[in-house]
Amino acid sequence: MTPHRLQTMVQRGEPIRERSCKGWRLDGMDLSGGVFIEVDFDGVSCIGTRFEESQFERCTLGGVRLNDAQLKKAAFSQCALTSADLTAAVLDDAVFHRCKLPGSDFSQASVVDTKFMESTLSRSRFAGGLLDRTLFFQSPLDGADLSGTRLDKAVFYQVDLRTTALGGARFERVVFVESRLGGHDFSRHHFLLCQFTDADLEGCNFEGAHMAQCNFKGARLRDAVLRGVHAPQALFPEADLSGTDARGAHFDQSLWIEAVLAGTDFGGASMQQCIFHRADCTGTSFAGTDLTYADFSEAMLAGANLDARLFRTQLHGARDVPDALRGNAGVLPNDPDLFEAQRWSAHRTRHPTPFTKGETQ
């Protein structure tokens, strides 16, 4: 088998099976649409090679040079690409499924709509690249370098990023689902419409960060630093911010339904029109906080410091309301109409009205 023979077979649509190309030079060749099964590409030079829509199954590509290679819509399944060089390669719409890519270099590569599924990416490098709509599904990135990358609509599902370098990265509409980012320093970072659903952010430093309209549903932010963050209209339902320092932050119109805020310090923060329904505010400090039109309906307020700016602040059904707030002109203690609506709703649930076909309820 020679490089020329290989190209001829690919052009004829013949699959390449159990061949060794070890040490070959395939620079600049057009191998688009090739099907490679258990082929040994270790150490092969494929600089500028065209592999569009090619398929690689159980191939070894250790140390392969794919600089500037065209790999659009290529598919890799159960392949080993240890220390592969993919700098400046085009990987748009490519798929890596159950591949081993430790130490691989994707610097300056175009990684648009690329999918990494259950693949190992430890110590890999994406520095300075574009990750646009890229999916990392259960693909470890421990020790990887994503510093200076632009992440736009990228998705990380159950990925451990605690030891991943993220300095200088740009986050736009990025989604982190059940991923771990604990301990990272994100101070003064900009997060545009990002989602951290059920993510582990324990101990992260977000001081001065911009997080307007970001979603932290179910996220763990224990002992995190949120001092001076700009996060209006952010969502924190069911999030755990126990012991978090959020002094001087801007959270106007943000949502905290059923959030755990025990021991959180919101001193001097702006929290106008925030919703704290059923939130655990045990020992929470709102000293000097602007709580104009905030709603603490059914929240737990045991030991909370509410020496704050209060104006039409709702405490409907709140538990353990501090005595100092009783009779405060800025507080709306209960809403009689809402109480009646809740009573009626509970009664209707216990005694539903029979519904007959042809009738309306």
Tell where the protein language model's regions lie, with residue ranges.
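Tandem repeat scaffolds
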Residues: 1-361
